[in-house]
Amino acid sequence: MGFTSILNDKLIGFYRSSYVENGVTKYLATSDMEPADARVAFPCFDEPEMKARFSIILGRKESWKSSSNMPKIGTNPIEGMPGYVWDFFDTTPVMSTYLVAMMVSEFVSTPSDPALSNVEFRVLTRPELQKDATYAANVGPRILEYFETFFGVAYPLAKEDLAAIPDFGPGAMENWGHINFRESYLIVNENTTASSKQRVVEVIAHELAHMWFGDLVTMEWWNNIWLNEGFARYLQYFGADSVEPSYKLHEQFVVNTLQRVLVSDSLDSTHPMSYPEEKSQVFDTIEYDKGASVIRMCANFLGMDTFRRGLNRYLTRNAYSNAVEEDLWNTLEEQAAIDGVILPDSLAKIMAPWTQTTNYPLITVKRTYIEGDGALVTQSRFVLPSGEGNSVQEDTVWWVPLTYSHDFSLHPTTAWMSTATRTLVSLAATSDQWVIFNVNQAGFYRVAYDEANYNMIADQLIASHGHISIPNRAQLLDDAFVLAKINKISYNIAMDLTLYLKYEREYVPWRSVLDELDYLDVMLHNEPQYVDWKIYMTSLVTPYYNHVGFQESESDAHLTILSRTDALNWACKLKIDDCVQNVKSQYAALMEQPDMRLSPNQRDFILRAGVENGRRAEWDFAYEQYKASDSDSFLIAMTYTRESSIVYDLLGKMLDPNSIRSEDVDKVFTNLAANPLGNAMALDFLVQRWNDIEDALGTSHFVTFFRSLCDRLNKQTQYEQMVKLRDDHFDILGNSTTVEQGLGVIQTNIEWMSANQLEIGEWLKDPSTATALPTTEATTEALTTTALPTTEATTEALTTTSTEHTSTLTSSTPSTTTTTSATPAPTTPSSGVIIQPYLSLAFLSAVLGQWVFRQ
């Protein structure tokens, strides 16, 4: 079939990109076919299950280069076109159309050391970035080798190219043998921050994992895209960890992936991982992060050895073909049976509620504190309240892999909670011992406890927080603050759990709770309670800040650098003097020598904090640097001023394109709206100068301006003012979902203040004190390096006791101690089962009488 097409500029199909080199615009042709844009490039049956072999021939100038999925096998002159040649590429294996890659450019290649991999590995960049391709060329082949060993399946192609594209829509695209990246997701140099370098290695690992999950075995249709993206997200932590073990990425999974999607999947607007109907082009946090979290949970209860062998079976059986989720569950279940892992039901039935319905369970644990201590464990769907009604299926119940422990030097107890809403659990703990469920937060659910258990946990954290694993410390904080925020537990409980933070030195627990603490800081900022809040937060942050210090050292561990970023932001927010003085000194030196190099990890912070703690001279310097360099860093820093006259001037400059570029006005206004001083002034500016704004900027910015103001507003008068603003300009702001969402945020803030402001204020007057004494810091920090053995899957006996969906549950509690470091998922489970005595009706009555949770 003959056809003719053109290179488009829409970043889809086979398209034209460009960049500037030495003042000259250079062009290249590249591709992005996912999900359904191969049809834009060439005639085809553009569906993932309609796989084919592709023989690609690309024409180019002799001085240019071309690349595709497969190695080049020949070059011939183009007849009648002197100076042009055809490049012939080897035929691909059978693959989906969306994986086809084509590129013609003046790029240069940086080859990897052949000793790192049996596969030819190159990084393709524009010439000026070649020196910055070394990191990718070093870690890429090592990650590929790791995955070959991990899966037990060889990479089937002869080469792998990683190409840095100047204009690229997604972050990266897993074309088989020719992965395309945004430049910032592949390039590492002396100006790359620690967090950006981590992102680079994770994205490389993510895309290389796709060479098996997505490319070798492809989902049958887009409604199962999580089979591609969930696995790639989960496995990126393994691949990246194999080359950067000091990043402790398996710990970071909890805060970077799991806890984030726990929020997304608790909204009314969420959707299942698998759609019953055909829905293409769904690439969001559910497919990626919930998919990864559910896969991680499955690996945990199967055991990592069984899980890996099952993946080998899945990849081998479905190679060069397509799969649906049942294919995955069936092969994993087959492997579980071979390995002696007995499941309480078919794996497909166990996993169906997790993949085919929305939300997840809240596990509520209520202990009896009587001899033969036990607990009533209930499950209920966790959905954040909204004013738009609830459309979820209330009858969903989950098979829940429960894990719990009272001593993190022992293997945790493991048990299955059946598809019942209540289960009686026999605990090994005595009444004066805490119990923590969801060990290492391996399960995709939240946990709430009775008040007595919370108090014992809080005491343990203060006495020696290292006796509780790092992921569980993060889980306790995250779950408690989310539950308190929606009035499931008292804020006193959540705040009690923060008391130990003055001893916490690990990045992950702090990162887990800082966003929630920031919300409290915003809500209380203009309230009488803010003085006590600031005193309390200073008592927590100061030791953390002193531990990491202001100055960066070449010997700093990766997580120390990330911790310092958080500690500095809070230290200067709280006006801790050492931080403020260091900022002023560094900013003054920068004003004296504008080309002075600042650490990339601290540069943006110093610019922002320098303006925040400065006066007019510091702001004027930032403004002049913005004008001279078009720097977003200086632009954002300008919005941090605490001088009202400067805020007023900056708002006025937004209306003059010679002062603030038109494309930057949204950044200026939204960041001013996040400024405690700027929020009120920005709102007044919007109300008073609406017509001037419309004349200067048009109407396209108003919805963004309106929404950005809402997050800090928490008074009924403010809500009424915003409603009036919407109604006065209904032709622009009316019928906007974004505007209504903003008004909903204000209502939520008002309700939160009504429910919690006074309670938190009372707590802050005299923060409760746990009776246990902290260990010495040296002991505490040593304990944090002792990790909990990961959960082992066991066979559980489940006996139905009534028609009210209550069951008794027995569990296996191996008592072997271990001091080995925690692994991402467990080894093959033991077969021992300990049958516990039946729990009596007296037990049930005692549990039901202890209800700390708000109805």
Where are these regions (language model features)?
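Glycine/proline-rich low-complexity spacer/linker segments in large multi-domain proteins
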Residues: 3-55, 105, 110-113, 442-462, ...
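Hydrophobic helix-coil surface modules that form long, contiguous segments used
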Residues: 31-36, 43-205, 234, 427-429, ...
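Hydrophobic alpha-helical and helix-loop surface patches within well-folded domains
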Residues: 89, 120-388, 519, 526-539, ...
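Long, ordered, helix-rich scaffold segments
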Residues: 258-259, 263, 371-372, 378, ...
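Long, intrinsically disordered low-complexity tandem-repeat segments
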Residues: 773-800
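C-terminal GPI-anchoring signal of eukaryotic secretory precursors
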Residues: 809-839
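Cleavable C-terminal sorting propeptides in eukaryotic secreted/cell-surface proteins
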Residues: 830-855
